[in-house]
């Protein structure tokens, strides 16, 4: 997990602790602050253990936190590599912002089997989604948390047309309008839902996307 520290680091640690009960793991959490004055690279280890239910074994997870500032950020990939467990899949989670042009993301993503991002945290989701599409088919699998959060909506829409009486209406659709409301102004979910609907209907984009 690569974070800029602060609240994002705290949220990542909390998520890892809650995941441990279902998925024992070794989590490597990186607090990378390249714009801060140089300081020696520091690291520490902590354990996440859950109180087991009756008759169940206790499950614990291990978290290694690496703190890097300034030039020390360039040492992070070389520090992470020997900490990976052989023969286990490596999941690389970048929880905030658009990482694609950042050197740390490029180097760490080469070590991962799957990369997880959240396009809802990007200032320009259109650009973020285009870059995500460019990464598809690369050695690492790509997952967007916005796409995962859309799963109930996609299932509901698909179920609506499961009925034989409704299926003919699906292919008579000429126009779709998605109305969304988000206090933060994020529109990545709306864009992904539109893209999914268009791909299922075999539509192609004939114009340039413009924001009102």
Name each model-derived stretch.
Residues 1-101:
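An N-terminal, globular interaction/scaffold subdomain
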Residues 150-210:
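ATP/pyrophosphate-binding catalytic subdomain of soluble kinases
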Residues 7, 71, 145, 181-185, ...:
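Conserved aromatic-histidine-acidic binding/catalytic patches
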Residues 38-43, 102, 127, 186-190, ...:
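Short, solvent-exposed polar/charged micro-motifs at secondary-structure junctions
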């Amino acid at each position: 997990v690569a974070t800029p520290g602060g609240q994002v680091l705290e949220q990542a640690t909390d998520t890892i602790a809650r995941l441990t009960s279902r998925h024992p793991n070794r989590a490597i959490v990186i607090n990378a602050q390249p714009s801060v004055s140089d300081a020696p690279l520091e690291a520490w280890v902590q354990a996440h253990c859950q109180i087991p239910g009756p008759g169940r074994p206790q499950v614990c997870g291990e978290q290694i936190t690496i703190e890097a500032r300034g030039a020390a950020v360039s040492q992070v990939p070389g520090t992470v590599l020997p900490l990976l467990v052989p023969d286990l899949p490596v999941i690389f989670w970048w929880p905030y912002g658009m990482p694609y042009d950042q050197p740390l993301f490029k180097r760490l993503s080469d070590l991962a089997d799957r990369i997880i991002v959240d396009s809802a945290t990007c200032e320009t989701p259109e650009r973020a989604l285009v870059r995500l599409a460019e990464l598809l088919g690369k050695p690492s699998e790509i997952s967007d948390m916005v796409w995962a959060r859309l799963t109930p909506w996609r299932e509901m829409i698909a179920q609506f047309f499961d009925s034989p009486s409704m299926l003919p209406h699906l292919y008579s659709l000429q126009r779709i309008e998605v109305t969304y409301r988000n206090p933060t102004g994020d529109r990545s979910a709306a864009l992904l839902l539109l893209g999914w609907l268009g791909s299922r209907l075999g539509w192609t984009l004939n114009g340039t996307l413009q924001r009102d």
